[in-house]
């Protein structure tokens, strides 16, 4: 993920990324990894919950409008299903899936 791609993320996620860079002093690379993991997670959820038109590709799925109510509606089962998706569909290895878990857990 590139720094300019962060603007396409939900405002709450953008604020979180600023916090971890400014206050928690994470490196720019770490912030971009978190951003990419969260973007993947939210795109997955929007597609799975049917909140994106079926003719819109995964990469073009708009997640910028995700709000606090949407985030509050996310369940542990959603996270588990996401990890299964990462393993089976994205072919993420164990280390990548573990990093994604950390990114999501720290955000929530």
Q: What are these language model-derived features?
A:
Residues 2-3, 14-29, 39-108:
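N-terminal core-binding DNA-recognition domain of tyrosine recombinases/integrases
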Residues 1-9:
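Acidic, low-complexity proline/glycine-rich segments
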């Amino acid at each position: 993920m590139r720094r300019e791609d962060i603007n396409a993320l939900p405002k709450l996620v953008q604020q979180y990324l600023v916090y971890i860079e400014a206050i928690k002093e994470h490196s720019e690379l770490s912030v971009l990894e978190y951003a990419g993991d969260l973007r993947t997670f939210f795109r997955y959820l929007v597609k799975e919950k049917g909140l994106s038109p079926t003719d819109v590709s995964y990469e073009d799925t708009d997640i910028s409008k995700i709000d606090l109510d949407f985030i509050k509606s996310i369940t542990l089962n959603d996270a588990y299903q996401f990890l299964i998706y990462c393993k089976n569909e994205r072919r993420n290895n164990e280390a990548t899936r573990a990093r994604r878990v950390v990114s999501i857990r720290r955000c929530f």
